[in-house]
């Protein structure tokens, strides 16, 4: 049975039921800002199947939304410059077209992408085998429950995006680079993401083990 370090989220578990004026009921999470601590992520990732790992490795290494990742083709990966072009984005240009975003990724992730392309025999125009959003959310909750994360209900795939941004901030990566990477303003980042003091030295070393040399040469923690 996995045993995790105590963290400040343990008192923010649970959900509450909301009743609409039409009588319909739905539930909302008490804590929508949950992110993974590195020991939680490593245990979660190790419990996934090989196919499931493709989705979640893309998410944690890019910080992209799952719909953005699902629309990435092999030809969108720049193997020489360690970057990925995101063409299907949430942000729009004035003419209504989607605003393209280029994401830096680590050389370690690029190496993994090459191996994945070979394993699945993908061609330049092929998409990567990314799970649907409902399937990814179900997979995440089932796996987190299996590995005994007490507040597993607080997670959705979007929390992986929150996790990478939180990690990069904790590593003291330049805030402008972080905001450009995730496609939102520094104000949004400071409002919804945590301070660098959340993680200790051991946590930060573990984060580097997970995300490799992503923004490694931009100063901050190494």
Show which residues each predicted segment covers.
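Short, charged phosphate-coordinating catalytic segments
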Residues: 2, 59-81, 176
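C-terminal secondary-structure termini that scaffold catalytic or DNA-interacting sites
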Residues: 2-21, 208-222
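Basic, Lys/Arg- and aromatic-enriched nucleic-acid-binding interface segment
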Residues: 24-66
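Conserved tyrosine-mediated DNA breakage-rejoining catalytic core shared by Y-recombinases
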Residues: 38, 71-112
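Short, basic (Lys/Arg/His-rich) helix/loop patches that form interaction surfaces
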Residues: 46, 121-126, 138-180, 187
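Short, polar N-cap/turn motifs at the start of nucleic acid-interacting alpha helices
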Residues: 76-79, 173-194, 221
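Catalytic-site neighborhood detector that most strongly recognizes the C-terminal catalytic loop/helix
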Residues: 90-92, 182-207
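C-terminal catalytic core of Y-nucleophile DNA break-rejoin enzymes
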Residues: 92-115, 122-142
């Amino acid at each position: 049975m996995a045993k995790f370090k105590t963290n400040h989220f343990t008192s923010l578990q649970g959900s509450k039921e909301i009743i609409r004026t039409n009588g319909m009921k739905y539930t909302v999470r008490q804590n929508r800002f949950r992110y993974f601590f590195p020991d939680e992520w490593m245990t979660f990732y190790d419990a996934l199947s090989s196919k499931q790992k493709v989705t979640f490795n893309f998410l944690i290494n890019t910080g992209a939304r799952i719909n953005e990742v699902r629309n990435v083709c092999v030809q969108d990966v720049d193997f020489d410059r360690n970057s990925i072009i995101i063409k299907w984005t949430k942000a729009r240009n004035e003419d209504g077209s989607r605003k393209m975003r280029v994401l830096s990724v680590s050389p370690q992730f690029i190496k993994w992408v090459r191996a994945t392309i070979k394993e699945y025999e993908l061609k330049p125009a092929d998409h990567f085998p990314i799970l649907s959003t409902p399937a990814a959310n179900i997979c995440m909750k089932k796996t987190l429950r299996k590995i005994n994360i007490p507040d597993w209900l607080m997670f959705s795939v979007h929390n992986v995006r929150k996790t990478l941004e939180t990690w990069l901030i904790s590593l003291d990566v330049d805030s402008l680079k972080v905001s450009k990477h995730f496609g939102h303003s520094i104000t949004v980042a400071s409002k919804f993401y945590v301070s660098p003091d959340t993680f200790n030295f051991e946590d930060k070393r573990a984060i580097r083990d997970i995300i490799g040399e992503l923004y490694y040469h931009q100063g901050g923690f190494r």
